[in-house]
């Protein structure tokens, strides 16, 4: 009986993990942003710093830019680190991108860093101008409760449903070619520069928050490789007439993207969690009860024309903003604000629940090591965040957690700002 229960708990936990994802844009959209600026802005910037790069090397760099564009979301997926994603979304988000760029040493690391800059532009813009405004349009009851802006923290389920709906609509309209799906799945991760930048900005080594980084990346890729075919299947089922009208002669076999497990492992290896009984049960539950309990977040919700317009406007604005940021990099004048990715607003205490919670988690983790890896810059940032303790900080809701936060804060104030282990490596 215990074995049977554990097998049922596994798929439930998997879906709950996926349902926690706070996505302004999907993996497809994040990577499409890279393609939109590649020839005019991104490739010339790479060639300016590395003028001898060959076309083959640039293709490899393109794959690393894809990886950078989605890396901040990796922690939302199974067998990864949610703390990694929360930190890069809510704590020193701009500083982390600038550190990636500054720490990059070769073509691939530079491309990866500039890809991560695209994620910054997309999330800070996409939530504020797109999803947060579109959700209340599609869900009138949420508008009545929260007003004209509904954040992910307000209602995670609506955000996830609507983002999937945007994806399906874009896939149905032929925004992506089959070759693009293959390239998207083949994203590369510049692990060394990511590790250096992360330790520099957060005072925490990535090995201390990831059980196995390579395994986490492999599972991320494998999840994406399964998600893309599912999007094409749903798009065909729901928008078949429109697809056939826009592409005469198209068939289901031609439209639906397929990547067999054998082909996947031949190209990308076997470093991922194999789909056993638990994964099969997850798929069965999602098909049978998509609107019940934790599975309700995975139900499809098509965007209204107005919501879709908001999404496209935010996407176009993101492209413009990203190109402007790349121009700043080119001129050596990039100065990013530490913004909350879910709202697009400057990070400050009491502004957003998830930011409050993440600062508290980082403070607690650093305190366990007596702040020995806390740089002067990180120390100043944390103290500035907690400068006004009268702010409506979400951590206060749990008296025990708040006491722990205050104790750690007092300990940090007493700590001397001196060179740290994380920065001296």
Question: What is each residue range found by the language model?
Answer:
Residues 23-111, 124-208, 223, 237-242, ...:
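N-terminal, motif-rich segments that launch catalysis or mediate targeting to/interaction with membranes
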């Amino acid at each position: 009986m215990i074995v049977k229960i554990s097998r049922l708990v596994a798929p439930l936990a998997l879906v709950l993990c996926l349902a926690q994802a706070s996505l302004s844009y999907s993996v497809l959209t994040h990577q499409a942003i890279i393609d939109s600026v590649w020839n005019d802005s991104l490739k010339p910037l790479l060639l300016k710093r590395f003028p001898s790069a060959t076309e083959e090397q640039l293709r490899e760099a393109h794959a690393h830019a894809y990886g950078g564009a989605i890396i901040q979301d990796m922690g939302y997926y199974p067998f990864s680190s949610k703390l990694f994603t929360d930190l890069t979304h809510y704590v020193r988000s701009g500083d982390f991108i600038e550190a990636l760029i500054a720490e990059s040493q070769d073509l691939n690391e530079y491309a990866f860093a500039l890809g991560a800059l695209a994620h910054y532009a997309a999330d800070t813009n996409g939530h504020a101008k797109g999803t947060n405004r579109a959700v209340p349009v599609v869900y009138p009851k949420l508008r009545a409760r929260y007003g004209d802006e509904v954040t992910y923290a307000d209602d995670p389920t609506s955000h996830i449903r609507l983002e999937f709906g945007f994806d399906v609509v874009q896939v149905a309209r032929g925004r992506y070619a089959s070759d693009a799906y293959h390239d998207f799945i083949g994203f590369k991760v510049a692990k060394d520069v990511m590790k250096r930048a992360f330790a520099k900005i957060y005072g925490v080594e990535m090995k201390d928050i990831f059980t196995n980084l390579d395994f986490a990346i492999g599972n991320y890729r494998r999840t994406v490789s399964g998600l893309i075919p599912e999007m094409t299947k749903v798009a065909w089922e729901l928008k078949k007439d429109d697809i056939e009208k826009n592409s005469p002669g198209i068939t289901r076999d031609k439209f639906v993207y397929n990547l067999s497990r054998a082909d996947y492992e031949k190209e990308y290896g076997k470093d991922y969690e194999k789909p056993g009984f638990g994964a099969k049960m997850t798929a069965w539950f999602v098909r049978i009860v998509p609107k019940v309990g934790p599975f309700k977040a995975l139900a499809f919700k098509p965007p209204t024309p107005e919501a879709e317009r908001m999404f496209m406007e935010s996407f176009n604005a993101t492209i413009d903003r990203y190109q402007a940021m790349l121009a700043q990099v080119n001129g050596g004048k990039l100065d990013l604000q530490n913004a909350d990715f879910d709202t697009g607003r400057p990070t400050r205490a009491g502004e957003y629940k998830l930011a409050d919670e993440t600062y508290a988690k980082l403070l607690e983790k650093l305190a366990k090591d007596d702040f020995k890896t806390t740089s002067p810059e990180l120390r100043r940032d944390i103290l500035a965040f907690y400068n006004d303790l009268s702010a409506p900080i979400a951590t206060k809701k749990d008296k025990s957690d708040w006491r722990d936060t205050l104790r750690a804060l007092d300990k940090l104030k007493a700590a001397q700002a001196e060179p740290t282990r994380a920065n001296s490596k």
